Amino acid sequence: DISAVAKMLKLKIPVSVSREFSGDFDVFAFGGNSFDQDECAKAKNTAETCYGPRIGLAIMVLDPKKASSALRIWEKTMSSDLKPLILAKAGGSATANFQTGTYQSQSIRYKNMPINTITVEYALSDDILIITTSKSAILKAIDSLPAQSIQETTPATEPAQ
């Protein structure tokens, strides 16, 4: 049960998001790579936590449109709510708001932390929600998706403020 795992990891996932979870999920680890290690070296950060392992979640969702809308609203607190997934001392955010990027026609929402090897990122591909704590980890997770899951997606519109 993803709710039990979230509780065990001390993650705060809003009910508006978790009610869209189907129950099928995976927790995975990305071991880091030389790109991240080089980026940390440029920033004069030699701590292994700067470039080391990252934890991610892959969660099946019931209704991708509802999940997308709920995720956009969650962005306001997502970084702090998922802080236990970040295995490094990241400090505050480098960007005030989430931004959108694209990889293999897949829309990715992300928020950078002070070091660009540490982020909070998510992508919704068909009915699979991927949440990671580094750019490298989400790209690797997208590469691992079945080919039919990778399709051009349009992010939900910003909720009214």
PLM region descriptions:
Residues 23, 27-32, 100, 105, ...:
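Intrinsically disordered, low-complexity regions enriched in small/polar residues
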